[in-house]
């Protein structure tokens, strides 16, 4: 993302992958400008600074650009992107405190991995049921203590698999 709350595709940034840009009621546009900021790198930028200062917000949504999400580039490119970010996240104080969950998901219609990384997850845990974006939304809402939106009451949260 080239600038906070960018509303136009630019280079490898696709606005369609950024949910914050679709909220337009009330103070949403101001909140988008304030809180929807470029990721940066594992070494510098908004997320790296928050990790260094141990001031992560309650919710962080990260979507890679069109190359690092492997839509337009080889899977190995996305693997390298994750290989730089995941260690940075799990070595952070926020993660070590046990309050952070990392979800790695894809937006493809075919069966895809759904990866959950958290200090509370027992290594080797496998979820035997189908997980979709509604289950992720339900889980996120439950973890944040938010009311359930739309169709999420009809899905199962995966919080028991998170050890919570």
Identify the residue ranges that each predicted region occupies.
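N-terminal pro-sequences and low-complexity stem/linker regions of secreted or lumenal proteins
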Residues: 1-164
């Amino acid at each position: 993302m080239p600038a906070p709350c960018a509303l136009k595709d630019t280079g490898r940034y696709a606005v369609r992958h950024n949910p914050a840009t679709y909220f337009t009621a009330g103070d949403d546009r101001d909140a988008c400008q304030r809180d929807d900021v470029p990721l940066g790198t594992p070494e510098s930028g908004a997320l790296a600074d928050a990790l260094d200062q141990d001031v992560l917000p309650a919710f962080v949504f990260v979507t890679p650009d069109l190359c690092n999400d492997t839509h337009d580039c080889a899977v190995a490119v996305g693997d390298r992107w994750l290989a730089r970010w995941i260690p940075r996240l799990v070595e952070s104080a926020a993660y070590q405190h046990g309050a952070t969950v990392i979800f790695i998901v894809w937006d493809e219609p075919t069966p895809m991995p759904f990866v959950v990384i958290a200090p509370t997850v027992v290594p080797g845990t496998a979820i035997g049921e189908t997980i979709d974006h509604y289950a992720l939304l339900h889980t996120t809402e439950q973890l944040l203590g938010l009311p359930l939106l739309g169709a999420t009451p009809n899905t199962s949260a995966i919080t028991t698999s998170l050890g919570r």
